[in-house]
Curated annotation (Swiss-Prot):
Protein S19 forms a complex with S13 that binds strongly to the 16S ribosomal RNA. InterPro entries: Ribosomal_uS19, Ribosomal_uS19_bac-type, Ribosomal_uS19_CS, Ribosomal_uS19_SF. GO terms for molecular function: rRNA binding; structural constituent of ribosome. GO terms for cellular component: cytoplasm; small ribosomal subunit. Belongs to the universal ribosomal protein uS19 family. GO terms for biological process: ribosomal small subunit assembly; translation. The keyword Isomerase does not apply. It holds the Pfam family Ribosomal_S19. It comes from the Bacteria. HAMAP family: Ribosomal_uS19. This is Small ribosomal subunit protein uS19.
């Protein structure tokens, strides 16, 4: 279910503070580490790189215009697929 329009998009305060600090300093190369997968990507995030935690390590996510409105967690998968098991009877 989508978030109510009257509430508006959500972003953690600590993440927004880190973004504002990075934009003010002009440091677009640094990776902003975050555990906040639930935060919505805002237009002022464009051009920044986030290290989004997937439960094991931080995955670098470079934000582009097409990502605005999505959540950070959508771009850092948490599960790895290794394929189905091989049938040992067929040899």
């Amino acid at each position: 279910m989508a978030r109510s329009l009257k509430k508006g998009p959500f972003c953690d305060h600590h993440l927004m503070a880190k973004v504002e600090e990075a934009v003010a300093s002009g440091n677009n190369k640094a990776v902003i580490k975050t555990w906040s997968r639930r935060s919505t990507i805002f237009p002022n995030f464009i051009g920044l790189t986030f290290g989004v935690y997937n439960g094991k390590k931080h995955i670098p996510v470079h934000v582009t215009e097409q990502m605005v409105g999505h959540k950070l967690g959508e771009f850092a998968p948490t599960r790895t697929y290794h394929g189905h098991g091989v049938d040992k009877k067929k040899k």
